[in-house]
Amino acid sequence: AYNQRKDRWSISYLRKAEKERIARGEIEVTGKDENGALILQFSKTVGRMKNPVTVWNQRSHNAGAGGSNVLRALIPGRAFAFPKSVYAVLDTIRFAVANKPHALIIDFFAGSGTTLHAVNLLNAEDGGHRRCIMVTNNEVSAEETKSLSAQGFQPGDDEWEKLGIARYVTWPRTVCAIEGHDVNGHPLKGNYLSGDPEHPRAMAEGFK
């Protein structure tokens, strides 16, 4: 390669990492120069990879704005302590599967279902077909346990199970996010904070 500033030629060899990026389509071979050296450029259709920084300071990553507020819109009146921001999870998984449109993501601690919600958002942004498997039990909160026990209910009773995290939070949140309405059947209001800021995705649009 010729360095015009230093008026110097040098020989550069493709390392294994660069060859792998060419194979993945991240770097394109656009031709050869007069000396037979390959001409490379970063793909315009595949996002350029970069290492994540240690600290993220974005309002959308706040557990209140991107976590509690989103969950409250989907399942109003149903409490869940400290839900993660769907946008923080979205940006986290983007680093791992941005160039894997058919990836399968497994969340062994599904909680309120934020990971699946984030996967749907990423698919909506780039047209991917990623899938997500969520694993959770159906335990009730400590407060609900005391209340239900005092009423004579126990695990396995319908009154107990319907207040468990899977049936009361995770599953309803997932259905509502996909269908674009809250648990009461009302269309969701507002837009998602991710994606194209000029053409934001309406929450009521869901993920069909």
Regions found by a protein language model. Name each.
Residues 73-74, 148-155, 188, 192:
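Generic alpha-helical propensity signal that fires on short helical segments
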Residues 82, 86-180:
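Conserved S-adenosyl-L-methionine
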Residues 40-42, 160, 193-195:
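Residue-level detector of functional hotspots within protein domains
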Residues 178-205:
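Short mixed-charge
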Residues 1-104, 126-129, 139-145:
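Class I S-adenosyl-L-methionine
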